Amino acid sequence: MLISRSSMPNLQKRHSDFKTPVYISRSISILNKIFHPCMYIYSRGITNDTYSSDTYELDWYDLGFVHFSKWVELAWCFLTLATWSFMKLLKTLRIVIYICTSDHWTHSLRFYYIELSKILLYLLICGVSLYGAIRIFINL
């Protein structure tokens, strides 16, 4: 007996379930445009035809450029994570400011504390991500 996916709605996934935020997808596309040669070199790997048998010259890609591109890609991921957490931090700050300026803010004190804990979490994520990216760029 064949079962179609349309008869089982729990197995269907909407396309919107897998969408990434706009700024993350834009930063990934910028990363692909800037570092496309690095990704190509990384996927190509070091082959035997890179070395010339009569001149013994090394291709300049083999002298650490692949290693360099991995670190740049990791630093870019840290910066993307820091950007995401900073945007979430600004959104949460806007909510907290709205709660504080409303007339009935004492009734939503529990919600206020939840939002403050989110702010601390986003600050921690942003700080650690920026620290990681800065340390990687310093060590390059």
Swiss-Prot record:
Transmembrane intervals: 63-83, 119-139
GO CC terms of this entry: endoplasmic reticulum; membrane
Subcellular location: Membrane
Membrane topology summary: Multi-pass membrane protein
Entry keyword set: Membrane, Transmembrane, Transmembrane helix
Protein name, per record: Uncharacterized protein C1271.08c
Protein's organism: Schizosaccharomyces pombe (strain 972 / ATCC 24843)
